[in-house]
């Protein structure tokens, strides 16, 4: 899933 904050595990 694409989220605003770049988190590990898009």
From Swiss-Prot:
Its cofactor is Zn(2+). Its EC number is 3.4.24.-. Ca(2+) binds at residues 7, 10. GO terms for biological process: proteolysis. It is found in: Secreted. GO terms for cellular component: extracellular region. Binds 1 zinc ion per subunit. Expressed by the venom gland. It comes from the Eukaryota. Keywords: Calcium, Cell adhesion impairing toxin, Disulfide bond, Glycoprotein, Hemostasis impairing toxin, Hydrolase, Metal-binding, Metalloprotease, Platelet aggregation inhibiting toxin, Protease, Secreted, Toxin, Zinc, Zymogen. One of its GO terms (molecular function) is metallopeptidase activity. It is an enzyme of class 3 (hydrolase). The keyword Nucleotide-binding does not apply. The proteinase activity is slightly enhanced by Ca(2+) and Mg(2+). Inhibited by EDTA and phenanthroline, but not by PMSF. N-glycosylated. Residues 5-10 form the Disintegrin domain. Belongs to the venom metalloproteinase (M12B) family. P-III subfamily. Zinc metalloprotease-disintegrin AAV1: snake venom zinc metalloprotease that binds to the platelet collagen receptor glycoprotein VI (GP6) thus inhibiting collagen- and convulxin- (a GP6 agonist) induced platelet aggregation and the tyrosine phosphorylation of intracellular signaling proteins (LAT, SYK, p76SLP76, PIK3C, and PLCG2) that follows GP6 activation. Interestingly, blocks platelet aggregation but does not affect shape change. Also degrades the Aalpha chain of fibrinogen (FGA), followed by the Bbeta chain (FGB). Disintegrin AAV1-C: 30 kDa fragment of AAV1 autoproteolysed in absence of Ca(2+) that shows more potent inhibition of convulxin-induced platelet aggregation than AAV1. Monomeric (57 kDa), and polymeric (180 kDa) forms have been detected under non-reducing conditions on SDS-PAGE, whereas only one monomeric form is observed under reducing conditions. Negative results: does not cleave glycoprotein VI (GP6), gelatin (an irreversibly hydrolyzed form of collagen), fibronectin, prothrombin, and gamma chain of fibrinogen. May not bind to alpha-2/beta-1 integrin (ITGA2/ITGB1). This is Zinc metalloproteinase-disintegrin-like AAV1. It comes from Deinagkistrodon acutus (Hundred-pace snake). The lineage of its organism: Eukaryota, Metazoa, Chordata, Craniata, Vertebrata.
């Amino acid at each position: 899933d694409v989220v605003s904050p770049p988190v590990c595990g898009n």
